[in-house]
Amino acid sequence: MPHTVATPPPLLQVRGISKQFSGVVVLKSIDFTLQPGQVHALLGGNGAGKSTLMKIIAGILPPDTGVIEMNGQPCFNLTPAKAHQLGIYLVPQEPMLFANLSVQENILFRLPKHQADKKKMAQLLKNLGCHLDLSVSAGSLEVADQQLVEIMRGLMRDSRILILDEPTASLTPAETHRLFSQIRMLLQQGVGVVFISHKLPEIRQLADWVSVMRDGGIALSGSTADFSTEDMIQAMTPEAQKGALTDSQKLWLELPGNRRAQSRAQSQQPVIHVHDLSGEGFAHISFHVQAGEILGLAGVVGAGRTELAETLYGLRPASTGNVILEEVNITAMKTANRLAAGLVYLPEDRQASGLYLDAPLSWNVCALAHDRQGLWTQPAQEAAVLERYRRALNIKFSHLEQPVRTLSGGNQQKLLIAKCLEANPLLLIIDEPTRGVDVSARSDIYQLIRSIAEQQVAIIFISSDLEEVVQMADRVLVMHQGEINGALSGAAMNVDTIMHMAFGEHRSVSEPQSGTASSAENKGTSC
């Protein structure tokens, strides 16, 4: 009788996992498998259930039904500590570091002594190409560097199952390449990786297997090579809206009491004029933005884009230079006064800086108005405002008093945009608006930003995704090491040129300025 070799069990097997929140079904009898040395990509629209499933596997949430097995052995009553002991580690989409502890303390936090090896930490940092100061507080890092620290925490734990939730959302292409090299090294050691991403080219580059979630279930699963990009997109968003916002959505979206009177809408005077501005992380910055223009701000992490945005909003002091908003010098104004004057900032980190996670949705959407009007709230008015933006932006939620933290990432981002719009901006600074947002919600946000510009709002658009910068901007300023390395517009505005300029090459190409630029045909150039 021939001898048969038993097939080893999967590294991870999830069977029949279901979950409800307040009677709402978010996971429907999910089956999910991860083999040793495999990258299993998980795709899905915002609210599809990806994060809930991963939190159950990581012991953060208990399932209502179903079984989790690791190497063929059932895992009962999982907690985060127990999951870590078993070798399961979740790197969250939003960094969850201890802001007051140093980078090194965060990486080594609660590590067993046999794993808290500083030499190993130094080698891993070298492999990732990280040049972080380990002594600085984690709260002082940019989001991309915080993400790398979170990844380091997982790598230091010798995890057998590494769950990466949007790990490259804030990373540069070079940082992404180094991370992927490190992942491939782990795969050779038999580590299994669950890779959650909305970047389909990355999934094709890295993942052996792909599963697509929709409405709490698995809509598609199989070898990545067997599916086209269109197959994956259709499985995620079979009824996704395509094209521009509908007329009714635009009607709901119209800014309340638009600050820009019709008589001034055609003014050639810039909405904002920045002259020789210097501050922490940048120097000698000069540019202007017209009404209705989308000005892209590109550069690698550390180029000074976020520092510039925070200085324009008044969160950081300027050392020299002037900022003129609608012919008023606001350089010395406090943030509250800049907000009242019409300068609104949508920050990069929506959870840490943009939204009050434990406050109700209705309160959040009017939060900037609260800043101007005091703490007295008007629940009926807040409810009406939230309903208006729900219709305009397709925000999905169960009830008005629902805490923000219960929303999916894409719906949180839409709520943050609604909050900024309710402040009635003249100038809207948008920092990484689609970080961690799915394909469908990303398209919604693009159309939304264009619709805002059509209402003669000036927009500064900051993004690490160079393709979306080219797609969205009328002009692009490229920053390198805290300075503007050049301005691009028209045919010169392409990913390759921007990338070279972001790394210090001088390729600035501009066309004669055409004044207000609110469409692709009216792209200004002078900075």
Curated annotation (Swiss-Prot):
Native source species: Yersinia pseudotuberculosis serotype IB (strain PB1/+)
Name of the encoding gene: lsrA
Keywords, sorted A to Z: ATP-binding, Cell inner membrane, Cell membrane, Membrane, Nucleotide-binding, Repeat, Translocase, Transport
Name this polypeptide is given: Autoinducer 2 import ATP-binding protein LsrA
GO annotations of cellular component type: plasma membrane
SUPFAM superfamilies reported for this sequence: P-loop containing nucleoside triphosphate hydrolases
Residues reported to bind ATP: G44, G45, N46, G47, A48, G49, K50, S51
Catalytic activity from the UniProt record: ATP + H2O + (2R,4S)-2-methyl-2,3,3,4-tetrahydroxytetrahydrofuran-[AI-2-binding protein]Side 1 = ADP + phosphate + (2R,4S)-2-methyl-2,3,3,4-tetrahydroxytetrahydrofuranSide 2 + [AI-2-binding protein]Side 1
Subunit structure: The complex is composed of two ATP-binding proteins (LsrA), two transmembrane proteins (LsrC and LsrD) and a solute-binding protein (LsrB).
